[in-house]
Amino acid sequence: MEVNRKDNSFLITGGGGYFGFRLACALLKTSSKVVLFDVSPPIQDLPEGLIFMRADIRDYAQVEKAVRGSHCVFHIASYGMSGREQLNRKLIEEVNVKGTENILRACVAHSVPRLIYTSTFNVVFGGQEIKNGDESLPYLPLHLHPDHYSRTKSIAEMQVLKANNLALSNSTGVLRTCALRPAGIYGPGEQRHLPRIVSYIENGIFRFVYGDPDSLVEFVHVDNLVSAHLLAADALTEKQQCRAAGQAYFISDGRPVNNFEFFRPLVEGLGYSFPTLRLPISMIYFFAFLTEMVHFVVGRIYNFQPLLTRTEVYKTGVTHYFSMRKAREELGYEPKLYDLEDVVQWFQARGHGKKRSRSSIRKLILDVFVVVAFVAVLLSCLPVVGQ
């Protein structure tokens, strides 16, 4: 795939993260300048020609400095996607909403003609079943979002699409914007979800699955997501009749799959047995609710990592998948086939995998812990005697 990127300067907010860095490396092959904007640098060494700018998206002065001179901005930066991050409402609001406002304001002020926003499936999903949905679906009402991350991402996406066709300062042109709504990202070296899953596997916590075995969700390999962003940037140019301007697109591998079956190759590839115990999703949701309540009470003293949040239960246990038709027809997006083989190899190369011997005492303690935890949840559901 060839995308016209010569003589262009690109800025990637959130460029220090896994996806942002992969996108930058792809852009660097043919563009004149690629700048990574983030509060932390990538864990990888920067290839020659890639520029890192340490800055905070909440600070307009820093955003303005970074945007100046750019021809296209990929706005990836966000906060609160998973785990305990989902429970920090203040920071989520500041990064996802105010940060997006800063980016839009700076793009207009410095006559940046293109902005691609990395959104999420969650702008239309809040726990309800969706089969082969498309972009005609309305936004989920803000008050129905089960978490603040999804709510603020929805607000930010609406801001971005509303900004399409805004007149640029000191220019006769306008700002062209679009939004991509990716599924859960995977690939070798992914640092948010996969390490957490592997830690659960290795620590003996992954002892059960939940929900309907026929429930289907979607994922997107990082390289497919990179491809979609490059195509979207090109589809905002005059050469491509700006056909993506003001549009949103669902992006995935296009292969709905049961969440737990998707990770089976990872579990078994690392030498562990796939769990056979299946629990009702209502029980897991209630457990997640209790965990969030405990975190709300003690989080400032001990900011522990919740096993699951309510949103994560929905995302992993309730059917929701979307059509790629619009992305295929308007962007030319054609996802390639990937599996978890390279992910398994990545973890194995770093010493992960079941060891030959394991303490039977440790295993017993873990088994007892799991049983006690779920007995406690069940007992908490029972009515109090005498009331």
From Swiss-Prot:
Residues bound to NAD(+): K153
EC primary class: oxidoreductase
A Pfam short name: 3Beta_HSD
Molecular function per GO: oxidoreductase activity, acting on the CH-OH group of donors, NAD or NADP as acceptor
Coiled-coil residues: none
Main location: membrane
Domain of life, source organism: Eukaryota
Membrane topology: Multi-pass membrane protein
EC identifiers of the protein: 1.1.1.-
Transmembrane segments: 279-299, 365-385
Family annotation (InterPro entries): 3Beta_OHSteriod_DH/Estase, Lipid_A_modif_metabolic_enz, NAD(P)-bd_dom_sf
Alphabetical list of Gene3D superfamilies matching this protein: NAD(P)-binding Rossmann-like Domain (3.40.50.720)
GO biological process, one term: steroid biosynthetic process
SUPFAM superfamilies given in the database record: NAD(P)-binding Rossmann-fold domains (SSF51735)
Residues annotated as catalytic: Y149
Key words of the record: Membrane, NAD, Oxidoreductase, Transmembrane, Transmembrane helix
Localization terms from the record: Membrane
GO cellular component assignments: membrane
Database matches in PANTHER family: BIFUNCTIONAL POLYMYXIN RESISTANCE PROTEIN ARNA, SHORT CHAIN DEHYDROGENASE_REDUCTASE FAMILY 42E, MEMBER 2
Family designation: Belongs to the 3-beta-HSD family.
Official protein name in the record: Short-chain dehydrogenase/reductase family 42E member 1
Species for this entry: Danio rerio
Lineage, broadest ranks: Eukaryota, Metazoa, Chordata, Craniata, Vertebrata
